[in-house]
């Protein structure tokens, strides 16, 4: 039975039994930054099980895409070496939200397996929790399962959503693959040991309790059911194979890989046990097939390889696959072709694979090209380090080496670990982590000098003590730039003090402030803190937890702990920063609309001068796309939408559709910032009151910062206006230089002046003219050299084989390498067989070209001759046996160099 038939049969069976067919959710969880990837069928129903969301149905059935490759559920390192571990798998499941419970859930599962799939009952075993007599009785009395085929376990048969929340016993169904699949014949022991013969194919969770506090179980008024079965495992059972990789879900990809690499896939366990080389090939093919699935589906759902969060996990999966591909063949590419096979076989079930086909394949090829260069170079360097360690009898690779591989060569630490372990060498994990931590500290300290220095460590303790004492700090900056506060703590940068005087620099903590502390990508405010005639200039503002640190220079008077003060943020700096920050939110929304929903924020920096926004995208943003993005943002600015902020629970914010960043920690109550129906994000920064205050938005640069991450820099308000005014001035100058008359009607003039009607066309036309003139000039330069005379004066020498050949030594007063190369070719054609050495005349460095006829390049190499000539003249160069080029500064030694060539040829 095909896997597609099993999937369809499952859906239809439960639909027939009153279940709502719910499509698979994306692998990228929507509005749940706590979850790395969708890893179970119940993920999309989480709020329903928690009682936070009501649906218009109480029964559901799904075939859910799942990835387990990071966090709590991480199967990555097992993939390829066991029969049933995968990074990507499909979980088919049925769910009851306060509807049916144990009796129906058990009946549905047993009926589907034994009647719809016609699995022999003697091939199945079930497990229940040690306390769940009810489930055991249902299995025996209702479904007729013999008591001896029902086993009881403890923790393995009790499921929890977390430390607190819904939980309950579960019952699992195991399939017996027979004695050939494993060595343990006793089913209880085999199941307990997780042996390959007895494989779990379905788990039924009975959510009948609520745990809170931990250890205290309260019965739920409406128990629910959450079930999940692995399609891969069901397929193996129905297709009569022991290993999931031998099913039709993997074999099309594996067979294609065998064809690409001209290799053989062997699945027989006994054969593999006796043939380590074949076992290595089989494991590599299984890794490739599995990782191709997770890679393709993750990219289709919006993930991109990067160095953080979900993107980093995807990159690890892809690079692990690429490395195993290199083990199979040094010059063959496997992943793109295998991805095409996957799209062909599963695209009808998951149409996103087909609609995003080009994006998937381009992303895979790009990451493969990048990593192979890193892999080849890094592997060679790592092998040298491992050889050194072995020669000294060292069994551990130092953390410094692992960090250097990562930091200098871009070689992933986990890959270093794998390669080292394969050769029996461990990695000093603690030392590596220390190197990483030291590097992070250095990076923080170097960022514009704004980070906390070591001499401020005492303030961290003070800030935390202040918070723990129950005192609060009020931020007044959302209401305005001026406010009242009291000095609560002072530091001179070395220790706490009671007073700062004129000329002192240090840190100041207030109980209330209008100054925004650097955070969330927004720079800290600047301005003044005053009392009476005393004035402190705030040069930067940072934050520890919720305590704002004002970095101050006392310009006049003194400040003491307990002094009442007035805070005044620089209004121009605040206004410009707010415009840039609000524009960043509009930019984020516009990017997702123009480029796709795979775009997510990967970093940002907002200050009064510009906004810098990093985002996930695997190719440059085209000029047409940039224009669309700018138009969308400026359209929202022109609409004069009010910028609304609202405090609400984190859950309510996500339900409202607010964008949340994966990996970001949020408080229970969050600030939601909305601009019309265009943008809705969680944000604690300062913003404009109305989009019209942004005035104008202009992108000034777009570039890549790492694989899969692009960066846009943009300006707003006065900066954008000045930029545009300058651009118009330059345009006017360019128009005049191109022959257009300056006038208010020049645009109309451009439209009616013939084939060079636009400035761009005129510039392109001029560029073509310049290229043609350069070509003609080079032709004239080449014509200045009398090739016939040089060929006629060629010297004759004998090759090692005794044949006659010609030698031309030419001193040519030209510096264009292309022209010199053409002269060299003409000379070689004239003499037919021999050697041509041409030295040009440049400004400080003189080009040298050596060309040798192919029939004698085996005994006399162009590169060797070039090194001698260039060496005499104080230069260097290199090339192929038949052609080489270089340069040298000392033309005075030209005759000596030519004499050297003659002597080498016996002249």
Swiss-Prot record:
Domain of life: Bacteria
Cofactor field: Zn(2+)
Binding site for Zn(2+): 581, 585, 683, 687
Biological-process GO terms, alphabetical: alanyl-tRNA aminoacylation; negative regulation of DNA-templated transcription
GO cellular component: cytosol
PROSITE patterns from the UniProt entry: AA_TRNA_LIGASE_II_ALA
InterPro entries with a match to the protein in the record: aa-tRNA-synth_II/BPL/LPL, Ala-tRNA-lgiase_IIc, Ala-tRNA-ligase_IIc_anticod-bd, Ala-tRNA-synth_IIc_core, Ala-tRNA-synth_IIc_N, Ala-tRNA_ligase, Ala_tRNA_ligase_euk/bac, DHHA1_dom
Disulfide topology: none
Location relative to the cell: Cytoplasm
Reactions accelerated catalytically: tRNA(Ala) + L-alanine + ATP = L-alanyl-tRNA(Ala) + AMP + diphosphate
Cofactor details (free text): Binds 1 zinc ion per subunit.
GO molecular function, one term: alanine-tRNA ligase activity
EC number: 6.1.1.7
Residue ranges of the TM segments: none
Function comment: Catalyzes the attachment of alanine to tRNA(Ala) in a two-step reaction: alanine is first activated by ATP to form Ala-AMP and then transferred to the acceptor end of tRNA(Ala). Also edits incorrectly charged Ser-tRNA(Ala) and Gly-tRNA(Ala) via its editing domain.
Family: Belongs to the class-II aminoacyl-tRNA synthetase family.
PANTHER family assigned to the protein according to its UniProt record, in alphabetical order: ALANINE--TRNA LIGASE, CYTOPLASMIC, ALANYL-TRNA SYNTHETASE
Name this protein carries in UniProt: Alanine--tRNA ligase
Record organism: Bdellovibrio bacteriovorus (strain ATCC 15356 / DSM 50701 / NCIMB 9529 / HD100)
């Amino acid at each position: 039975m095909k896997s597609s038939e099993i999937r369809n049969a499952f859906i239809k069976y439960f639909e027939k039994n009153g279940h709502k067919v719910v499509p698979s959710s994306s692998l990228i969880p929507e509005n749940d930054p706590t979850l790395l990837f969708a890893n179970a069928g119940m993920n999309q129903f989480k709020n329903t099980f928690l009682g936070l969301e009501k649906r218009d149905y109480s029964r559901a059935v799904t075939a859910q895409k799942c990835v387990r490759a990071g966090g709590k559920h991480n199967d990555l390192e097992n993939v390829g070496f066991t029969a049933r571990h995968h990074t990507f798998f499909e979980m088919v499941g049925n769910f009851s939200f306060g509807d049916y419970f144990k009796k129906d859930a058990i009946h549905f599962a047993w009926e589907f397996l034994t009647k719809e799939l016609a699995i022999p009952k003697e091939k199945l075993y079930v497990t229940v929790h040690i306390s769940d007599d009810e489930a055991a009785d249902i299995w025996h009395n209702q479904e007729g399962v013999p008591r001896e085929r029902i086993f009881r376990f403890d923790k393995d048969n009790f499921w929890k959503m977390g430390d607190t929340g819904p939980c309950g016993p579960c019952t699992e169904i195991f399939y017996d693959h027979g004695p050939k699949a494993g060595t343990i014949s006793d089913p209880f022991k085999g199941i307990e040991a997780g042996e390959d013969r007895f494989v779990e194919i379905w788990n039924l969770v009975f959510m009948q309790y609520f745990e809170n506090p931990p250890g205290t179980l309260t019965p739920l008024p409406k128990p629910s059911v959450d079930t999940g079965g692995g399609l891969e495992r069901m397929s193996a059972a129905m297709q009569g194979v022991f290993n999931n990789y031998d099913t039709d879900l993997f074999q099309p990809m594996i067979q294609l890989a065998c064809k690409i690499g001209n290799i053989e896939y062997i699945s027989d366990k006994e054969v593999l046990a006796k043939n380590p080389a074949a076992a290595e090939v089989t494991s590599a093919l299984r890794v490739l097939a599995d990782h191709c699935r997770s890679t393709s589906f993750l990219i289709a759902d919006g993930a991109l390889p990067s160095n953080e969060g979900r993107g980093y996990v995807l990159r690890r999966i892809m690079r692990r696959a690429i490395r195993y591909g290199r083990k199979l063949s040094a010059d063959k590419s496997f992943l793109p072709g295998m991805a095409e096979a996957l799209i062909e076989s599963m695209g009808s079930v998951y149409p996103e694979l087909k609609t995003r086909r080009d994006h998937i394949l381009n992303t895979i090829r790009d990451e493969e090209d990048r990593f192979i260069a890193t892999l080849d170079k890094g592997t060679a360097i790592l092998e040298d380090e491992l050889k050194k360690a072995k020669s000294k009898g060292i069994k551990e690779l130092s953390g410094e080496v692992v960090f250097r591989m990562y930091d200098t060569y871009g070689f992933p630490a986990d890959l270093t670990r794998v390669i080292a372990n394969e050769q029996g060498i461990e990695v000093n994990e603690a030392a590596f982590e220390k190197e990483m931590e030291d590097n992070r500290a250095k990076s923080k300290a170097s960022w514009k000098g704004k980070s906390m220095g070591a001499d401020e460590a005492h303030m961290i303790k003070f800030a935390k003590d202040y918070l723990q004492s129950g005192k609060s700090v009020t931020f007044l900056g959302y209401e305005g730039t001026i406010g009242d506060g009291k000095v609560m703590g002072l530091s001179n940068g070395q220790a706490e003090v009671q007073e700062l005087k004129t000329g002192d620099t240090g840190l100041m903590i207030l109980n209330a402030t209008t100054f925004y502390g650097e955070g969330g990508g927004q720079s800290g405010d600047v301005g003044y803190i005053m009392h009476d005639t005393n004035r402190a200039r705030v040069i930067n503002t940072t934050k520890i937890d919720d305590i704002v640190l004002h970095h101050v220079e006392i310009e006049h008077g003194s400040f003491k702990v307990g002094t009442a003060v007035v805070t005044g943020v620089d209004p121009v700096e605040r206004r410009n920063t707010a415009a840039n920050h609000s524009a960043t939110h509009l930019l984020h929304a516009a990017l997702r609309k123009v480029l796709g929903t795979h775009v997510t924020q990967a970093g940002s920096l907002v200050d009064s001068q510009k906004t810098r926004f990093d985002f996930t995208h695997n190719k440059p943003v085209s000029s047409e796309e940039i224009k669309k993005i700018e138009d969308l943002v400026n359209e929202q600015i022109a609409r004069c939408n009010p910028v609304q902020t609202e405090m609400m629970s984190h859950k309510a914010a996500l339900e409202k559709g607010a964008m949340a960043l994966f990996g970001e920690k949020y408080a229970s109550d969050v600030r939601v910032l909305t601009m019309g129906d265009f943008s809705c994000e969680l944000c604690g920064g300062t913003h404009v009151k109305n989009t019209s205050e942004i005035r104008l938005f202009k992108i000034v640069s777009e570039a890549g910062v790492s694989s899969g991450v692009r960066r846009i820099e943009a300006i707003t308000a006065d900066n954008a206006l000045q930029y545009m005014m300058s651009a118009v001035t330059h345009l006017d100058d360019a128009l005049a230089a191109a022959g257009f008359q300056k006038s208010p009607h020049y645009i109309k003039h451009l439209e009616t002046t013939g084939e060079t009607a636009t400035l761009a066309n005129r510039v392109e036309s001029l560029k073509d003219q310049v290229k043609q003139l350069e070509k003609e000039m080079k032709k004239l330069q080449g014509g200045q050299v009398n090739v016939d005379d040089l060929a006629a004066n060629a010297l004759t020498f004998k090759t090692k084989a005794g044949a006659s050949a010609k030698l031309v030594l030419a001193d040519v007063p030209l510096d264009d390498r292309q022209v010199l190369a053409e002269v060299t070719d003409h000379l070689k054609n004239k003499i037919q067989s021999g050697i041509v050495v041409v030295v040009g005349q440049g400004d400080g460095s003189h080009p040298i070209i050596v060309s040798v006829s192919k029939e004698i390049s085996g005994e006399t190499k162009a590169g060797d001759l070039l090194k001698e000539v260039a060496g005499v003249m104080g230069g260097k160069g290199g090339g192929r046996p038949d052609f080489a080029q270089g340069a040298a500064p000392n033309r005075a030694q030209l005759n000596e160099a030519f004499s050297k060539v003659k002597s080498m040829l016996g002249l």
